């Protein structure tokens, strides 16, 4: 976590969609990039389900159906994959619940579930302010507040410290409640505490950590329950323990438990024997406990003022959600403002990055021209941008053999084929019962080599991959992916010859050549990385880069320092026939993360044919039928086409990124049959989803041009390609 002075809070000020009413006592969970909020309230209890997309900054109200639960507050709310469970809470003043509901978020379908009672004893009583934590296939319920009175208007509070275990069925439904026999001293009764579960990587014993809460007075004690031995203990901690509090939030990211907000003593820590020890206030203090070392670290103290409104104001009863390494905070009771008949609640949404982002995937090529690249990389969740850099050493630009022959070298690495294209498979099958909606995946960069059947044609290692973008595609993420059709049993759809899948391939790298660039740039020293720029999205059109100032090896910044002023730097154009190395790093509120692995691409050389386009794959009795359209820019007469299949070899097993290709077709036709026997030797590429890889290239009078790569996704990697 960044030092306290480097905390970079962000308030989300621009969003769309129906924003939920400000409230307190609500709960939130995360499903991938979605923050899902339910319950809570202020002037009445809310019963809507609100969803916030952290990528698009959009709020929406899903159309839920089924056994829709009543609105509740201070309830239990956990997420298991795409299943959400709601337990208990206050449904109206003085009336609490012990009902359990399940939401299948993939269908927005609610269902009321009825778990079996414990083998001995009663099920949990109605309550609010309890903790409800998930680990594996079990939920753990601890403590809360019950109403002893049968009359909801006559509230007689009873603090609880009971402990229940709820076993879940796989996918949907529950088995029942049980009351585990625990050892050691049980924590005192409480409500509005927090409980999280953490398991060290090197020792597989999960622990539940309970912190704070309310039992007539606020608490600051920390308890640990070993979920294997069911032993309670009070771990000894180091550092400054946060003030006693309730209605705070606790979130685990990595090995840290982050505590934010809540009700704390009004006079700080010196409240013993004070006449004001019953006065309380909201706080915006922020601390974390290292769960491996049991050491507390204060990031924002209770006494630390915020005159610039640069972080969330004091609050309680808010929600906090961890998405990746980013924490989101929404709403809650305002710590200062008051109203006659209701609390004043915060309307703001904040987030805080707790770590620098991880390295993105290698830069992947979509399109190459003589003086530009269109590149992409896989998205990194919860980042604010990407720094793209390139490196080139023009003194070491390698010449290649004559590019007039088919690319069918035997074994070994073939530099021109370092990068495969990204493909989109458009399903043209009209029968919706046989295929599901396509799923998206990206093709990662990789090296490769070629292997062919005996052939009288000369070997050539000068062919690389490039093809133009399809004219009807856009530059959004959906254009840079394979799409997979699967039946209900997770198999590839069997397509008859008359019903085909369309493949539009985007690109690969370009051919090496003996030609010398006509306008060479100034020679750069090796390992000098120049900025291409900072990009909001995970795609970039690269035609220029910024030259380094004299004496500098890199423009990378440390921490969250400002980015360079590119207007003061000189630009340099890309030149034909030149190899460029690329790397990319993600940026968030903590600064610039580590760079990706390197990728190398080469700008095109004029005169070679473009890549074949509109590739189609369909199954037939012999195997599969592979067809394509001629290049849109043949640059002369097309003399022949070559098609290749990535095959299994010991070399690929040792280095999966080094694909070996076998030529399966050479001729003038724009189609070929790939037999079942050939497919039996196919290599299954696991770069993203399991896939069989084909490459197709065209040859004119000057030689072979770049190839189009197609990844034929396999729904079940354990089955043969045609099973």
Curated annotation (Swiss-Prot):
* Alphabetical list of InterPro entries matching this protein: FN3_dom, FN3_sf, HCF1/2, Ig-like_fold, Kelch-typ_b-propeller
Q: Which domain of life is it from?
A: Eukaryota
Q: Which GO terms describe its cellular component?
A: cytoplasm; histone methyltransferase complex; MLL1 complex; MLL1/2 complex; nucleus; Set1C/COMPASS complex
Q: Which PROSITE patterns match?
A: FN3 (PS50853)
Q: Which organism is it from?
A: Rattus norvegicus
In terms of CDD domains, this protein maps to: FN3
SUPFAM superfamilies from the entry? Fibronectin type III, Kelch motif
Coiled-coil annotated residue ranges, if any: none
Ranges for the Fibronectin type-III domain? 357-436, 516-606, 608-720
Give the GO biological process terms: antiviral innate immune response; chromatin remodeling; immune response involved in response to exogenous dsRNA; negative regulation of transcription by RNA polymerase II; regulation of DNA-templated transcription; regulation of toll-like receptor 3 signaling pathway; regulation of transcription by RNA polymerase II
* Predominant cellular place of this UniProt entry's protein: cytoplasm
Q: Does the keyword ATP-binding apply?
A: no
Q: Which GO terms describe its molecular function?
A: transcription coactivator activity; transcription coregulator activity
Region Disordered: what ranges? 398-472
What stretches of residues are Kelch repeats?
Answer: 34-79, 83-130, 207-255, 257-305
Q: How does it assemble?
A: Binds KMT2A/MLL1. Component of the MLL1/MLL complex, at least composed of KMT2A/MLL1, ASH2L, RBBP5, DPY30, WDR5, MEN1, HCFC1 and HCFC2. Interacts with TASOR.
Q: Where in the cell is it found?
A: Cytoplasm; Nucleus
Q: What is this protein called?
A: Host cell factor 2
């Amino acid at each position: 976590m960044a030092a306290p002075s480097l905390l970079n809070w962000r308030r989300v000020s621009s969003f769309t969609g129906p924003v939920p009413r400000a409230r307190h006592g609500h709960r939130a969970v995360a499903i991938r990039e979605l923050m899902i909020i339910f319950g809570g309230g202020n002037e009445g209890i809310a019963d809507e389900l609100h969803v916030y997309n952290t990528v698009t900054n959009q709020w929406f109200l899903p159309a839920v159906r089924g056994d829709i639960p009543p609105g509740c507050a201070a309830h239990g709310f956990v997420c298991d994959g795409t299943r959400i469970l709601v337990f208990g809470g206050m449904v109206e003043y003085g009336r609490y619940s012990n009902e359990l509901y399940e939401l299948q978020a993939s269908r927005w379908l609610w269902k009321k579930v009825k778990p079996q009672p414990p083998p001995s004893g009663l099920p949990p009583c109605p309550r609010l302010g309890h903790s409800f934590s998930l680990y594996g296939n079990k939920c753990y319920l601890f403590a809360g507040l019950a109403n002893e009175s049968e009359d909801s208007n006559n509230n007689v509070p009873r603090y609880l410290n009971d402990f229940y275990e709820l076993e879940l069925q796989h996918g949907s439904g529950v088995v029942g409640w049980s009351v585990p026999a625990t050892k050691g001293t049980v924590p005192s009764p409480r409500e509005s505490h927090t409980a999280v579960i953490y398991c060290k990587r090197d020792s597989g014993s999960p622990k539940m950590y309970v912190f704070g809460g309310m039992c007539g007075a606020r608490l600051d004690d920390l308890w640990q329950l070993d979920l294997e031995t069911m032993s309670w203990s009070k771990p000894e901690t180091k550092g400054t323990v946060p003030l006693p509090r309730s209605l705070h939030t606790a979130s685990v990211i990595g090995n840290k438990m982050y505590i934010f907000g809540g009700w704390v003593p009004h006079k700080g820590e010196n409240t013993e024997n004070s006449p004001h020890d019953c006065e309380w206030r909201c706080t915006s203090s922020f601390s974390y406990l290292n769960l491996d070392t049991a050491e507390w670290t204060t990031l924002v103290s209770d006494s630390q003022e915020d005159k610039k409104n640069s972080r969330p104001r004091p609050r309680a009863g808010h929600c906090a959600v961890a998405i990746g390494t980013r924490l989101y905070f929404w709403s809650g009771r305002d710590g200062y403002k008051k109203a006659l008949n209701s609390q004043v609640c915060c309307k703001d949404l904040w987030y805080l990055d707790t770590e620098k982002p991880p390295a993105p995937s290698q830069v992947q090529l979509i399109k190459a021209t003589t003086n530009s690249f269109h590149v992409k990389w896989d998205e990194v969740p919860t980042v604010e941008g990407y720094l793209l850099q390139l490196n080139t050493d023009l003194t070491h630009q390698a010449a290649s053999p004559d590019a007039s022959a088919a690319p069918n070298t035997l074994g070994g690495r073939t530099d021109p084929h370092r990068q495969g294209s990204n493909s989109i498979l458009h399903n043209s099958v009209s029968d919706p019962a046989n295929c599901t909606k396509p799923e998206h995946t990206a093709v990662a960069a990789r090296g490769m080599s070629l292997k062919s059947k005996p052939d009288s044609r000369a070997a050539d290692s000068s062919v690389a991959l490039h093809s133009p973008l399809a004219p009807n595609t856009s530059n959004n993420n959906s254009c840079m992916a394979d799409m997979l059709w699967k039946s209900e049993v997770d198999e590839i759809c069997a397509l008859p010859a008359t019903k085909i899948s369309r493949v539009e391939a985007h690109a690969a790298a370009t051919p090496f050549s003996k030609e010398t660039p006509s306008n060479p740039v100034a020679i750069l020293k090796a390992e000098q990385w120049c900025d291409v720029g900072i990009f909001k999205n995970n795609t970039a059109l690269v035609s220029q880069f910024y030259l380094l100032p004299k004496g500098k090896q890199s423009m990378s910044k440390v921490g969250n320092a400002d980015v360079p002023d590119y207007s003061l730097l000189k630009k340099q154009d890309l030149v034909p026939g030149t190899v460029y190395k690329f790397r990319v790093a993600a940026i968030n509120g903590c600064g610039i993360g580590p760079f990706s692995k390197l990728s190398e691409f080469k700008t095109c050389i004029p005169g070679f044919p473009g890549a074949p386009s509109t590739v189609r794959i369909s199954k037939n009795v012999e195997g599969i039928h592979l067809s394509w359209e001629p290049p849109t820019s043949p640059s002369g007469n097309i003399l022949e086409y070559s098609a290749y299949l990535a095959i299994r070899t010991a070399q690929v097993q040792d280095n999966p990124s080094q694909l070996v290709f076998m030529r399966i077709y050479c001729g003038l036709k724009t189609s070929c049959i790939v037999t079942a026997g050939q497919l039996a030797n196919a290599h299954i590429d696991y770069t993203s989803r399991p896939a069989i890889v084909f490459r197709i290239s065209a040859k004119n009078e000057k030689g072979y041009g770049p190839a189009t790569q197609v990844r034929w996704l396999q729904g079940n990697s354990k089955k043969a390609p045609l099973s």
